[in-house]
Regions:
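Single conserved hydrophobic/aromatic residue that forms the stacking wall/gate
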Residues: 1-9, 13
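Left-handed beta-helix
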Residues: 19-185
């Protein structure tokens, strides 16, 4: 039956993912699709337009930043509007007096009190007074205290950035801020 085939395929897929993780290999395309294409029955669909392989933190960063480009947004939300995600019935983002947002995506449930430029802000995040967020990705449920400067960073979900903090990645170097720790990539 179709259900049994789907379940069996899912089990094989899960085993391959676990095997790759044990060997510290995390690139789905290189480590699974290409590696097993001649050994397993792998089928695909040719994508003519936008597609990115996210195999590193830099890939994750650049792919998120691609959504700041109008042509990429239009591809997903106008040309193919049937892209669905989880719905959280949250209020729209709130921009308080004095806030400034330029070339950024700010999700529902966010409150912005500072300056946000060229950044992607995921849902339910709070940007404090006099903050500057530039060229960064702020994941879900992040609290950023007042007078904080974040640039060229990825801030992990459910993190709290204390007031008067300063995180700046230089050039191609990105900083991943995770649970009040700092990792340079």
């Amino acid at each position: 039956s179709t259900l049994m085939r789907s379940s069996a395929a899912s089990d094989v897929y899960k085993r391959q993912i676990e095997k790759c993780a044990e060997e510290d290999r995390y690139d789905f395309v290189r480590d699974i699709l290409i590696r097993y294409k001649d050994l397993k029955r792998i089928y695909g669909y040719k994508i003519k337009d936008y597609w990115r392989n996210i195999a590193s933190v830099d890939d994750y960063y650049s792919t998120n930043m691609d959504f700041l480009k109008a042509d990429v947004r239009n591809y997903f939300f106008k040309q193919y509007p049937d892209v669905y995600s989880k719905v959280d019935d949250l209020p729209p983002a709130k921009y308080n007096p004095g806030s400034q947002v330029r070339n950024s995506l700010v999700s529902s449930g966010c409150i912005v009190n500072g300056v946000v430029e060229n950044s992607v802000i995921f849902k339910k995040s709070y940007i404090g007074n006099n903050c500057v967020i530039k060229n960064s990705i702020i994941l879900n449920d992040v609290y950023i205290g007042d007078n904080t400067h974040i640039e060229n960073c990825i801030v992990e979900s459910r993190d709290t950035i204390r007031a008067n903090s300063y995180f700046v990645g230089e050039g191609e170097v990105k900083i991943v801020v995770e649970r009040n720790e700092r990792y340079v990539i």
